[in-house]
């Protein structure tokens, strides 16, 4: 959530930065916001006046009674009663206005950092660097579906069990999928300093509001809202949502906390399934495992001091790159433009891995600095050197998406005979097996 003080003091600057996101709809009705703000200020001033007047009259009652003047005391009591009524009405309206302002702010995305390239969509993203050279084998390349089926990938069974965009893995390929997740966790915890966590796969609405998925992106979530006993709807305050990413529970670890500077940075990681309805993705990546309703991911989250958050962004991007390099997978790093960034991000780097069958790079990790945007929603703060409570900065990133890494391994390490070479870094997790064979 944006700092409301910025919108009060310099709304033109905030709107100008928001407009660089280049979306068709306005993010904030500025005139409505300013009208509510004007009423809030008037009511706040009047409320303070009424409180002061009530306190003054209450003192006067005591003085009048002490002086043996019950008539004056009765007059003061009547005035106190009238001021209490007006005070209650003012307080109720003030609470309503603050709720309306909160709702407005919850719909406004984060301000892009000044270093983010300006653009309308993915075509405006800027390539920063590449690593690795895509191979050019002499044999005809297959995609991960054709490679994976003889190795235990069963998409038809996924459809039978659950519907489109679900997959079943058996035998060798299931083992490789598990090995990838274990490898990623071991690197993140053993080399990069993250604390491994086991988290719930279903969270409450407050957790999703804290990280920014609710209320704006509810259509992309799976929930229990319509799954009550005997078909009765579940009230919103008791509904649970399947996590779209373990960023949600991990970042919510610090919801409502006031940390010390000594506790920062906090580095957390978790391997979880992720669940997304993929609303708006109809017709995209319908073949194979690129875009699934359920997929596994190892997530990185850092909670840091504001002064070090952009250093942490570079560090986390390097942590994701290290995994791809250990696996020998060619990739490139993209700086996302203003129009392609996520709702809560101030700056994002995407890592895109080379997929030979598509002859293109595809996203395998997204690493974002949300600055204080999530922290304000979460009321996650630390006590700074001046002794004041200040929002922390939060960052998150994939380290990595397990299914897409599996896809990249199958396609980049495929052999002419249909086998798939296991990269050396993974062999300890595969009991020394050097290749998967049909």
Swiss-Prot record:
Pfam families: Seryl_tRNA_N, tRNA-synt_2b
Function of the molecule: Catalyzes the attachment of serine to tRNA(Ser). Is also able to aminoacylate tRNA(Sec) with serine, to form the misacylated tRNA L-seryl-tRNA(Sec), which will be further converted into selenocysteinyl-tRNA(Sec).
Residues engaged in binding L-serine: 245-247, 299, 398
Major place of residence: cytoplasm
Gene it is expressed from: serS
Swiss-Prot/TrEMBL keywords: Aminoacyl-tRNA synthetase, ATP-binding, Cytoplasm, Ligase, Nucleotide-binding, Protein biosynthesis
Protein's recorded name: Serine--tRNA ligase
Catalytic activity: tRNA(Ser) + L-serine + ATP = L-seryl-tRNA(Ser) + AMP + diphosphate + H(+); tRNA(Sec) + L-serine + ATP = L-seryl-tRNA(Sec) + AMP + diphosphate + H(+)
Lineage: Bacteria, Pseudomonadati, Pseudomonadota, Betaproteobacteria, Burkholderiales
Residues the record lists as binding ATP: 276-278, 363-366
């Amino acid at each position: 959530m944006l700092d409301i003080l910025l919108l009060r003091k310099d709304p033109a600057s905030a709107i100008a930065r928001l407009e660089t996101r280049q979306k068709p709809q306005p993010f904030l009705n500025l005139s409505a916001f300013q009208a509510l703000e004007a009423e809030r200020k008037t009511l706040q001033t009047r409320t303070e006046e009424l409180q002061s007047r009530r306190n003054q009259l209450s003192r006067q009652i005591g003085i009048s009674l002490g002086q043996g003047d019950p008539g004056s005391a009765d007059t003061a009591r009547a005035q106190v009663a009238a001021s209490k009524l007006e005070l209650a009405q003012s307080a109720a309206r003030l609470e309503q206005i603050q709720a309306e302002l909160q709702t407005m702010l919850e719909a406004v995305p984060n301000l892009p950092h000044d270093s983010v390239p300006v653009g309308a969509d993915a075509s405006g993203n800027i390539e920063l660097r590449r690593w690795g050279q895509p191979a050019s084998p002499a044999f005809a390349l297959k995609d991960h579906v054709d490679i994976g089926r003889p190795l235990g990938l069963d998409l038809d069974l996924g459809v039978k069990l659950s519907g489109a965009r679900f997959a079943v893995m058996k035998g060798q390929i299931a083992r490789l999928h598990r090995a990838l997740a274990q490898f990623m966790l071991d690197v993140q915890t053993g080399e990069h300093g993250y604390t491994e966590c086991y988290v719930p796969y279903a969270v409450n609405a407050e957790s999703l509001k804290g990280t920014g998925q609710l209320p704006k992106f509810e259509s992309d979530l799976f929930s229990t809202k319509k799954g009550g006993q005997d078909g009765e709807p579940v009230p919103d305050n008791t509904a649970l949502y399947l996590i779209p990413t373990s960023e949600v529970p991990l970042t919510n670890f610090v919801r409502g906390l006031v940390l010390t500077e000594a506790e920062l940075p906090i580095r957390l990681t978790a391997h979880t399934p992720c669940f997304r309805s993929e609303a708006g993705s109809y017709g995209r990546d319908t073949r194979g495992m690129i875009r699934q309703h359920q997929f596994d991911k190892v997530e990185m989250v850092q909670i840091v001091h504001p002064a070090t958050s952009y250093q942490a962004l570079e560090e986390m991007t390097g942590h994701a790159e290290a995994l791809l390099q250990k696996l020998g997978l060619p990739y490139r790093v993209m700086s996302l433009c203003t129009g392609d960034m996520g709702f809560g991000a101030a700056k994002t780097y995407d890592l895109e891995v080379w997929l030979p069958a598509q002859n293109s790079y595809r996203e395998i990790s997204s690493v974002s600095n949300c600055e204080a945007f999530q922290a304000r929603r979460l009321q996650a703060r630390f006590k700074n050197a001046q002794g004041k409570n200040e929002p922390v900065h939060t960052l998150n990133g994939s380290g990595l998406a397990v299914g897409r890494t599996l896809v990249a391994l199958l396609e980049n390490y495929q052999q002419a005979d249909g086998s798939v070479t296991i990269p050396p870094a993974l062999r300890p997790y595969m009991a020394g097996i050097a290749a998967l064979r049909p």
